[in-house]
Amino acid sequence: MSKYEEVAVHGYEEFCKAVSDRKGKEIFAYFSGDKDEHGKSWCPDCVKAEPVVRAELPHLPEGTVFIYCQVGDRPYWKDSNNDFKKTLKLTGVPTLLRYGTPQKLVEEECFKADLVRMMFTED
């Protein structure tokens, strides 16, 4: 049994529901481009970052929630009016953030295991 809960969601509404269902818990969220039927994202940086982020998951604090969110297809993501950009102020994928704080890693920063681990382990 792992010490954190992982939740996979697709799209903004599912993300919001996952967050509201876990009110009061510390939440880390990873946003990635949608995956195709072969499990490969249209976003090459997401493909590169995911194994780095996953390798650091054991460092998540006990009792936290890790939400893996697919943001949609490329045309949806590129639309500057999508809810992820408008409401969550995301600027790129992949993005790893500590929900409710200004802490986030964007794009190439997610390739760096030391930065990912620092986000998971520092208060």
UniProtKB/Swiss-Prot annotation:
<dbReference type="Pfam" id="PF06110">
    <property type="entry name" value="TXD17-like_Trx"/>
</dbReference>
<comment type="similarity">
    <text>Belongs to the thioredoxin family.</text>
</comment>
<comment type="function">
    <text>Disulfide reductase. May participate in various redox reactions through the reversible oxidation of its active center dithiol to a disulfide and catalyze dithiol-disulfide exchange reactions. Has peroxidase activity and may contribute to the elimination of cellular hydrogen peroxide.</text>
</comment>
<keyword id="KW-0963">Cytoplasm</keyword>
<dbReference type="GO" id="GO:0047134">
    <property type="term" value="F:protein-disulfide reductase [NAD(P)H] activity"/>
</dbReference>
<protein>
    <recommendedName>
        <fullName>Thioredoxin domain-containing protein 17</fullName>
    </recommendedName>
</protein>
<feature type="site" description="Contributes to redox potential value">
    <location>
        <position position="44"/>
    </location>
</feature>
<keyword id="KW-0676">Redox-active center</keyword>
<dbReference type="InterPro" id="IPR036249">
    <property type="entry name" value="Thioredoxin-like_sf"/>
</dbReference>
<feature type="active site" description="Nucleophile">
    <location>
        <position position="43"/>
    </location>
</feature>
<keyword id="KW-1015">Disulfide bond</keyword>
<dbReference type="GO" id="GO:0005829">
    <property type="term" value="C:cytosol"/>
</dbReference>
<feature type="site" description="Contributes to redox potential value">
    <location>
        <position position="45"/>
    </location>
</feature>
<feature type="domain" description="Thioredoxin">
    <location>
        <begin position="41"/>
        <end position="123"/>
    </location>
</feature>
<feature type="active site" description="Nucleophile">
    <location>
        <position position="46"/>
    </location>
</feature>
<dbReference type="InterPro" id="IPR010357">
    <property type="entry name" value="TXNDC17_dom"/>
</dbReference>
<dbReference type="InterPro" id="IPR045108">
    <property type="entry name" value="TXNDC17-like"/>
</dbReference>
<feature type="disulfide bond" description="Redox-active">
    <location>
        <begin position="43"/>
        <end position="46"/>
    </location>
</feature>
